[in-house]
Amino acid sequence: MGLATTTSSMSQDYHHHQGIFSFSNGFHRSSSTTHQEEVDESAVVSGAQIPVYETAGMLSEMFAYPGGGGGGSGGEILDQSTKQLLEQQNRHNNNNNSTLHMLLPNHHQGFAFTDENTMQPQQQQHFTWPSSSSDHHQNRDMIGTVHVEGGKGLSLSLSSSLAAAKAEEYRSIYCAAVDGTSSSSNASAHHHQFNQFKNLLLENSSSQHHHHQVVGHFGSSSSSPMAASSSIGGIYTLRNSKYTKPAQELLEEFCSVGRGHFKKNKLSRNNSNPNTTGGGGGGGSSSSAGTANDSPPLSPADRIEHQRRKVKLLSMLEEVDRRYNHYCEQMQMVVNSFDQVMGYGAAVPYTTLAQKAMSRHFRCLKDAVAVQLKRSCELLGDKEAAGAASSGLTKGETPRLRLLEQSLRQQRAFHHMGMMEQEAWRPQRGLPERSVNILRAWLFEHFLNPYPSDADKHLLARQTGLSRNQVSNWFINARVRLWKPMVEEMYQQEAKEREEAEEENENQQQQRRQQQTNNNDTKPNNNENNFTVITAQTPTTMTSTHHENDSSFLSSVAAASHGGSDAFTVATCQQDVSDFHVDGDGVNVIRFGTKQTGDVSLTLGLRHSGNIPDKNTSFSVRDFGDF
């Protein structure tokens, strides 16, 4: 009674899980040889739906049988399973247009021990494979092999995990190719590839043939099928799990696993529906442009709402930065602890990709918040906060201020990247150094307009941990003590440069004026010289006899000598004179003087030969009487 109940439950369980593990056990082979040969020809069932095989029900019932079961019980089990296989074959006899066939062409020939000394051909292996496209869609991950040994035991075995994984991979490629291609040429090419895979699986099964032969009772070979079924079941579970795709995406993000495959899939998905994507994108861009350009003026209530939204977005942006900095600090702590144990630089291969991935996540989040913030600022008309910096010179802006602002921005960027060493901390009165650094950085970043708005003050108060009044007071003092002197110094320096330039221009103009005046002065001097020369040449036609015979001349000389004047000089220019020549041509000086005797003396400006006793020889007028 117990045996019949067990047989019935086993047959029902086997009927429920038909299709993938189609086998007949090996109890009393002699009573079912003809039926077994027919079962070998119907191993592949065309169009049959392949359910997931669960080994718990069948194997547990198999383990309930004793190791040396009698012939009657074994024969009943064999007849029952053979009958079910024949019914299955008759039911699918009409659907014989399958493109797949058994992986083992010589499946009728096998070797199993029927007794200790005799070898005879026995059924060794059956392999079932889904054939129709509908079955591919429904059950793609069902594959397995069954080995039936003659003699004293029965062995249920699946292919190895590696072979099963390869089979699953090739089968998924084949199914995807068949689903995606409709032409007969592509289908034939993939079918050829699948035939190559069958040969590979055949070689693998033939190389591992001796591992599946069992001699003895059933219990001795039960551990291998259980291990194989559990491994292949784990693979099926992982492949069909709903967490597989998210896990693959995470691996792609962190370790760049399958990056190209995922990119191709995303591109194919985007290109599969180009009209919808393009239309939606175009419509969105046009609508956003229209709202940006034609946005009506905001009401006071809307403006207040956008102000609140702007403050919230700024706080969110600050929170993202704070979380990212906290993540970097925690990661650095882990890296330091790992380096202390494993050596310096040992954590770099493990943390680089993770840091890049997390930085990408934080950047995406920050960009999303920044886009919303920019939109709110544009609606409020705050172009500086929106990132639309005005081009050209504004009020109070000079090229020097612009250069200073650029240098300060570069210095701040270097500080953020860690390229510049941080200043050593030192105790300081007043506000905390960290808060002062944040406020000073904001001041130099907005050097052209160092007047924070209410939202900026609120954000700076959150960043520095100060109150809003402290932030306002600090900016008032900073504008008076720091910003204003710098601006005044810049303007003074520019004014000084302008004055120097003006002085240089004035000096150049003065030099030009002096040169012009010198040129003008040289021209009248030349005219006067010409005039004097002309007037001096008029009395040169006089002769010596005229001077001697003129009584008025002599009287004038005498009167001059008695008048008290000691001497006077008369210059005459004798040029082209033919009657009077004294020592050649040239200018001769005649000096009239008075001696102690009262006689008029005359001195000629002649060079003496050296033997003249007196240098200033005077002659009387009487001496010239005969001349």
UniProtKB/Swiss-Prot annotation:
<dbReference type="InterPro" id="IPR008422">
    <property type="entry name" value="KN_HD"/>
</dbReference>
<dbReference type="Pfam" id="PF07526">
    <property type="entry name" value="POX"/>
</dbReference>
<dbReference type="InterPro" id="IPR050224">
    <property type="entry name" value="TALE_homeobox"/>
</dbReference>
<dbReference type="Pfam" id="PF05920">
    <property type="entry name" value="Homeobox_KN"/>
</dbReference>
<dbReference type="InterPro" id="IPR009057">
    <property type="entry name" value="Homeodomain-like_sf"/>
</dbReference>
<dbReference type="GO" id="GO:0003700">
    <property type="term" value="F:DNA-binding transcription factor activity"/>
</dbReference>
<comment type="subunit">
    <text>May form heterodimeric complexes with TALE/KNOX proteins. Interacts with OFP1, OFP2 and OFP5. Interacts with KNATM, isoform KNATM-B.</text>
</comment>
<feature type="region of interest" description="Disordered">
    <location>
        <begin position="263"/>
        <end position="307"/>
    </location>
</feature>
<feature type="compositionally biased region" description="Low complexity">
    <location>
        <begin position="215"/>
        <end position="225"/>
    </location>
</feature>
<keyword id="KW-0539">Nucleus</keyword>
<feature type="compositionally biased region" description="Low complexity">
    <location>
        <begin position="507"/>
        <end position="530"/>
    </location>
</feature>
<dbReference type="GO" id="GO:0005634">
    <property type="term" value="C:nucleus"/>
</dbReference>
<keyword id="KW-0371">Homeobox</keyword>
<dbReference type="GO" id="GO:0003677">
    <property type="term" value="F:DNA binding"/>
</dbReference>
<dbReference type="InterPro" id="IPR006563">
    <property type="entry name" value="POX_dom"/>
</dbReference>
<feature type="region of interest" description="Disordered">
    <location>
        <begin position="494"/>
        <end position="530"/>
    </location>
</feature>
<comment type="similarity">
    <text>Belongs to the TALE/BELL homeobox family.</text>
</comment>
<comment type="function">
    <text>Transcription factor that establishes leaf shape by repressing growth in specific subdomains of the leaf. Negatively regulates knox homeobox gene KNAT1/BP expression.</text>
</comment>
<dbReference type="GO" id="GO:0048363">
    <property type="term" value="P:mucilage pectin metabolic process"/>
</dbReference>
<feature type="DNA-binding region" description="Homeobox">
    <location>
        <begin position="424"/>
        <end position="486"/>
    </location>
</feature>
<dbReference type="GO" id="GO:0009965">
    <property type="term" value="P:leaf morphogenesis"/>
</dbReference>
<feature type="region of interest" description="BELL domain">
    <location>
        <begin position="302"/>
        <end position="373"/>
    </location>
</feature>
<keyword id="KW-0804">Transcription</keyword>
<feature type="region of interest" description="Disordered">
    <location>
        <begin position="206"/>
        <end position="225"/>
    </location>
</feature>
<keyword id="KW-0805">Transcription regulation</keyword>
<keyword id="KW-0238">DNA-binding</keyword>
<dbReference type="InterPro" id="IPR001356">
    <property type="entry name" value="HD"/>
</dbReference>
<protein>
    <recommendedName>
        <fullName>BEL1-like homeodomain protein 4</fullName>
    </recommendedName>
</protein>
<feature type="region of interest" description="SR/KY domain">
    <location>
        <begin position="241"/>
        <end position="257"/>
    </location>
</feature>
